[in-house]
């Protein structure tokens, strides 16, 4: 069953969109509809707000989220009150969001729901841990790739990336940018000693010397353009807890004292550098590592932009597959092996395979 069987190998999955309207919610519904809930306990939540009928920016139609009977979910108090399903209340946490506390419940009937869960990475981790503690075997996170998001989808073991014409209607640009993001997702973990030392640190710029001692660079911000690296002759690892941007990466690349210094960020969502600067850094011998990462198992595409421009799906999928060496699926196709339930089917949500069967 395509990438569904791959998902079942992990205890958590995040589904993230390269940009709004790239088919993230369609991908989420596709996964939720096909998971074997009769033999797997599943919970779902969202980093942002998902399940709205209209995009608040483009004012275009959005697919709603449909939960099946027996699935667990975490959402804010505000959106829990707006649910259109019968549910059993499991927990009301101390985790506060702008829309109230996070409510965890079990769907007793299938139906539509708005999701807005934990708003920070630490809160998301706690919720996931609580779910696993009560016997949930797979946690699904509706994720976000945004500098404004305090919660990272990279806390999950596995990931699906949704891309599409909403990002760019130029196919080559879309393929190149998607391939770049895939490269970032695949950045390896740093060594175990660094993980233990750096994981608790959530702010600032730090370095580890050749004796394993940790030092804070209190005079440096990763977002500042006016700073100098001083007293770092023995730097072995340079850690940026916040956002990594072009200016900072360029200064690291041009500093001869940091030639052998491994650059570490929390995860790929903290990297906001251009492909050009990233490749220059690697070409100069630079090494980037992360503290947490997810296994990217598939990429989905939405070839139609909110403005109505449609790219050729077969060509786009072929070019992406060649560029990233991963399965690429167009879930918007009319020909699929399985269709979504009629109860929430507003558009045909489908999948391209080498062999296809007609939807009924």
Indicate residue ranges for each PLM-predicted region.
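Walker A (P-loop) phosphate-binding motif
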Residues: 2-47
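Short, basic, glycine/proline-bearing loop/turn elements
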Residues: 12-19, 106-117
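N-terminal phosphate/diphosphate-binding loop that engages ATP/GTP or pyrophosphate donors
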Residues: 31-106, 316-317
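General beta-strand structural signal in soluble alpha/beta enzymes
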Residues: 43-47, 116-117, 138-143, 161, ...
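A generic structural motif
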Residues: 46-47, 262-269, 327-337
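Conserved catalytic-core segment of NTP-binding enzymes
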Residues: 120, 124-138, 143-323, 341
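Charged/polar low-complexity intrinsically disordered segments
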Residues: 342, 351-353
């Amino acid at each position: 069953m395509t990438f569904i069987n791959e998902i079942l190998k992990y205890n958590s999955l995040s589904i993230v969109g390269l940009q709004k309207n790239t088919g993230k919610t369609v991908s989420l519904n596709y996964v939720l509809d096909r998971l074997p809930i009769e033999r797997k306990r599943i919970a779902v939540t969202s980093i942002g707000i998902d399940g709205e009928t209209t995009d608040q920016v483009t004012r275009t139609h959005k697919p709603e989220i449909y939960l099946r009977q027996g699935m667990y979910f975490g959402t804010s108090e505000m959106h829990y009150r707006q649910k259109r399903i019968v549910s059993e209340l499991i927990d009301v946490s101390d985790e506060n969001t702008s829309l109230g506390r996070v409510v965890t419940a079990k769907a007793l009937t299938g139906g539509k729901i708005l999701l807005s869960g934990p708003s920070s990475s630490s809160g998301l981790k706690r919720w996931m841990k609580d779910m696993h503690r009560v016997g949930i075997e797979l946690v699904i996170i509706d994720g976000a790739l945004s500098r404004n998001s305090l919660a990272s989808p990279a806390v999950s073991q596995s990931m699906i990336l949704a891309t599409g014409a909403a990002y760019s209607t130029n196919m080559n640009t879309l393929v190149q940018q998607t391939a770049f993001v895939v490269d970032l997702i695949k950045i390896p973990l740093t060594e175990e000693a660094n993980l233990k030392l750096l994981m608790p640190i959530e702010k600032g710029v730090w370095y580890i010397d050749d004796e394993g001692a940790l030092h804070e660079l209190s005079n440096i911000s990763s977002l500042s353009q006016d700073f100098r690296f001083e007293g770092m002759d023995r730097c072995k690892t340079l850690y940026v807890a916040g956002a990594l941007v072009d200016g900072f990466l360029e200064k690291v690349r041009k500093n001869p004292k940091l030639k052998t210094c491994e650059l570490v960020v929390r995860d790929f969502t903290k990297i906001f550098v251009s492909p050009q600067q990233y490749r220059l850094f690697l070409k100069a011998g630079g090494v980037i590592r992360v503290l947490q990462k997810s296994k990217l198992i598939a990429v989905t595409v939405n070839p139609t932009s909110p403005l109505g421009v449609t790219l050729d799906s077969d060509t786009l999928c072929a070019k992406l597959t060649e560029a990233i060496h991963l399965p690429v699926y167009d879930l918007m196709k009319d020909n699929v092996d399985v269709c979504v339930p009629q109860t929430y089917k507003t558009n045909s949500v489908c999948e391209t395979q080498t062999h296809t069967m007609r939807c009924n």
